[in-house]
Amino acid sequence: MLGLNGTPFQPATLQLTGIPGIQTGLTWVALIFCILYMISIVGNLSILTLVFWEPALHQPMYYFLSMLALNDLGVSFSTLPTVISTFCFNYNHVAFNACLVQMFFIHTFSFMESGILLAMSLDRFVAICYPLRYVTVLTHNRILAMGLGILTKSFTTLFPFPFVVKRLPFCKGNVLHHSYCLHPDLMKVACGDIHVNNIYGLLVIIFTYGMDSTFILLSYALILRAMLVIISQEQRLKALNTCMSHICAVLAFYVPIIAVSMIHRFWKSAPPVVHVMMSNVYLFVPPMLNPIIYSVKTKEIRKGILKFFHKSQA
């Protein structure tokens, strides 16, 4: 379908329905989302502040944790504008180009999260398998290079996404059954040949999530082998405890991702509310849970929090 200027038709705005079956503008729904955002933002800002001010946390593990916290803030802020406007102000229209920008940032931050979790697994691998070389292997320059590499890889991989979407005509309406813009939802209202989009999306998922998760599993296989060599059970438990926070963070991220991918690929007839709720889980739960997981499971973080409050009271 062509517009008046001879270019493929694209709606000026897209309408976001929020969660199908739940009316937008309801106070209790808005309150839930505000609480989720508050927990995520306050929790991740607290992690960043704690690592910055506490000298005992100036170690590779906590630098990677800071990257994770910063990325989780990016995930939260990339969805916040449309979610808040939809549920708090009952305004559910977003400009088409703004929707593409939001889609790009949501997917980019999600891919960066996967890369950071891989870097954190490598950190645990070096710490447990080569403890005497830990500081010399993971220097500040290498950590910075890893962070920039994750950013560059995610940005360049996702950069073509808005353009391969924008080339399509949109003639199936302008309604997205979501509270933010995602690539699969845009494909449902697009016309024309979407094979390029689907193939590119699948390759990107395999190249990013597939490879990252494979290397994370490989890292933990090598860690497990190293732990079995340790004679002392106390040392084994200590080594395992240093990995528990990261394992929980990996599960909180990858389990919803796998569930969403399976639903989109193999259960396309699922009610819209199922797709929306699962997408909300994978975008809202990890940024909210990660600060809690590391605060509960990491002794040094707990000590840092107590020390910070003691200083504040003094």
From Swiss-Prot:
It comes from the Eukaryota. GO terms for cellular component: membrane; plasma membrane. One of its GO terms (molecular function) is olfactory receptor activity. The keyword Transmembrane applies. It is a multi-pass membrane protein. Its main location: membrane. Belongs to the G-protein coupled receptor 1 family. Odorant receptor. This is Olfactory receptor 51I1.
